Regions:
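Long, non-coiled-coil amphipathic alpha-helical linker/lever segments
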Residues: 46, 53-102
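Long, low-complexity, intrinsically disordered segments
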Residues: 302, 306-330
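Nucleotide-state sensing region of NTPase/ATPase domains
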Residues: 1-41, 45-57, 111-118, 161-166
Length: 330
């Protein structure tokens, strides 16, 4: 009891068995951290994509994280050096494999990102992306397309662990391994996280998401489901057009938005629109559910656009949405 279980057609399945079963790409305002946030955000995004494409990627990452936690405990507890060296042997095995997976995947992703970024900016800016494993100490841009074999990765990782072992013991935490791999984006040669404008950073994230969806389709031969959570308000007109053009290409998409004016009549006409009105509290008791009125039938595209234009094209709040009330509470 209390343990999460997964069933597929009534049969129990491991979490790894479900990876990629329904491939999807999620785009939310929080994803802007991909361009300007911590390096761990980019590593997590790359691993999430890799886990959808390959169960091995998911399993290797899971194994590495277990080994890393164990090693960090040993370092924190000032365990004997022999124990740490023994743990390093296991870390090299799964760590080198994970970095190899990442490098090969990122090479494909970066090429697609560059193409989409050029399209978004009408060719006025160039995007480069660099992946550098933790054992390298060079400029990420110099290794944007470099991949390496498993044996090479194991040797390089083992050498780096031996070289920095003393520093790890002093700082009481692991410093070398896939948890320290670097991913950088460059716009016309400048680091996007440090020097990119907000608009440029948003273009980087949009290019990442479009490339992610394309890569899933190319490798799995299956179109992913797109989940777009209120991102239109975060994009300017040019970036919205690029995203709308992509989702118009026969790909199942779920979108939340407060302004239907972001979409053209053709897209609205083909969509099934569900509108939520202002929530009505049914109880003052803390924890009680709030009820919404929901319309489950399509809304005429012209009516939807007309209502949006009457609001001056500005994002509408739930109370400003056209009435979509059903009989009774949904």
């Amino acid at each position: 009891e209390g343990k999460k279980k997964h069933l597929l057609n009534g049969k129990p399945k491991r979490t790894a068995d479900l990876k990629g079963l329904v491939p999807s790409v999620t785009f939310t305002p929080d994803d802007l951290e991909l361009a300007k946030g911590a390096m761990s955000v980019r590593r997590a995004a790359l691993d999430a994509l890799g886990s959808q494409l390959s169960a091995n990627h998911y399993l290797i990452r899971r194994d590495y994280e277990k080994v890393l936690r164990h090693k960090n405990r040993l370092l924190k507890d000032e365990a004997p050096a022999a124990l740490v060296r023994a743990m390093n042997e296991t870390l090299v095995t799964c760590g080198a494999q994970l970095s190899c997976y990442r490098a090969a995947l990122f090479e494909k992703l970066a090429a697609s990102m560059a193409s989409y970024y050029a399209e978004i900016t009408d060719g006025h800016e160039r995007l480069d992306a660099g992946f550098v494993p933790s054992w390298e100490e060079h400029d990420p841009l110099s290794f944007a397309t470099r991949t390496f074999g498993r044996d090479e990765a194991r040797e390089a990782l083992a050498d780096a662990l031996a070289r920095r072992g003393g520093e790890e013991r002093v700082r009481k935490r692991a410093l070398v391994g896939p948890h320290a791999d670097r991913i950088e984006f460059f716009i016309d040669g400048k680091n996007a996280a440090l020097f990119g404008s907000q608009g440029q950073q948003r273009s980087v994230v949009l290019a990442f998401k479009l490339a992610e969806a394309t890569l899933i389709q190319d490798i799995l031969r299956q179109k992913p489901v797109l989940l777009l959570d209120d991102v239109m308000s975060e994009l300017d007109a040019a970036r919205r057009r690029a995203l709308v053009a992509f989702i118009s290409g026969d790909i199942q998409t779920f979108i939340t938005t407060t302004n239907l004016a972001y979409f053209d009549d053709d897209l609205l006409g083909a969509a099934r629109i569900v509108e939520l009105e202002k929530p009505r509290v049914t109880s003052e008791t803390p924890g009680e559910e709030r009820m919404f009125h929901v319309k489950h039938s399509p809304i005429d595209a012209r009516s939807a656009r007309g209502a949006a234009e009457e609001r001056g094209g500005r994002p509408s709040t739930p109370t400003e949405q056209p009435s979509a009330r059903t009989e009774g509470d949904a």
